[in-house]
């Protein structure tokens, strides 16, 4: 079972957030302030939150990878490729497939944890 599947289930269970979202990702956003019920592009709240979670994971990967590079340690090209893929999958109207986004989250967590282990091994 995917880690993020549980996260999404918890999000869906929260009655007060059931139909709410906040997405300010694109130029289509209503009045330039962000979509709060459903995206002008058609994105629903669950997909918006799943994308937010993926971007949170990408930020974590980026922070650790940056620290490794600042200490002149190698970071695999796969890390950069993952970041580009994850960012591209969140662009407007490109991917509303929650399952594929969750798979990326799971993969990202593995990458982040591997990088963290590498950093800890070097006392970074």
Predicted regions, residues:
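Long hydrophobic alpha-helices with heptad-repeat/coiled-coil character
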Residues: 1-2, 34
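Short, positively charged and aromatic/hydrophobic N-terminal segments
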Residues: 2-12
């Amino acid at each position: 079972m995917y880690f993020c599947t549980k996260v999404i289930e918890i999000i869906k269970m929260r009655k007060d957030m059931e139909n709410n979202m906040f997405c300010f990702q694109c130029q289509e956003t209503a009045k330039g302030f962000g979509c709060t019920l459903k995206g002008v592009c058609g994105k629903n709240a669950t997909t918006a939150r799943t994308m937010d979670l993926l971007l949170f994971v990408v930020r974590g990967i980026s922070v650790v990878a940056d620290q490794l590079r600042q200490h002149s340690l190698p970071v695999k090209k796969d890390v950069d490729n993952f970041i580009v893929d994850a960012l591209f999958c969140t662009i407007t109207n490109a991917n509303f497939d929650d399952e594929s986004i969750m798979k990326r989250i799971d993969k990202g967590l593995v990458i982040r944890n591997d990088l963290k282990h590498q950093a800890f091994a070097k006392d970074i």
